[in-house]
């Protein structure tokens, strides 16, 4: 399963030292930049978070790699 990475909110005290965490899903902007439609993502069971507005390059790269792997599998068949 593919998991998105998002930034943590800034805390007043350094309770959590990590800058990133695993998100609930990919944003619509990230899907669009990687070439996925919402229907394709749902068929592949890629999690989507409609509330997120940000787009992180790391997540776009993950989605592009996933799309390339799917195209290679289709060509092999």
Swiss-Prot record:
Q: Where is the signal peptide?
A: none
Keyword Ribosomal protein in the entry? The reply is yes
User: What is one cellular component GO term in this UniProt entry?
Assistant: ribonucleoprotein complex
Which cysteine-cysteine pairs are annotated as disulfide bonds in the entry? Answer: none
- Which keywords are on file for this protein? Ribonucleoprotein, Ribosomal protein
Alphabetical list of PROSITE patterns matching this protein: RIBOSOMAL_L13E
GO molecular function annotations of the record = structural constituent of ribosome
Q: Which InterPro entries match?
A: Ribosomal_eL13, Ribosomal_eL13_CS
Q: Which GO terms describe its biological process?
A: translation
Q: Which domain of life is it from?
A: Archaea
Q: Give the similarity note.
A: Belongs to the eukaryotic ribosomal protein eL13 family.
Please give the name of this protein. Large ribosomal subunit protein eL13
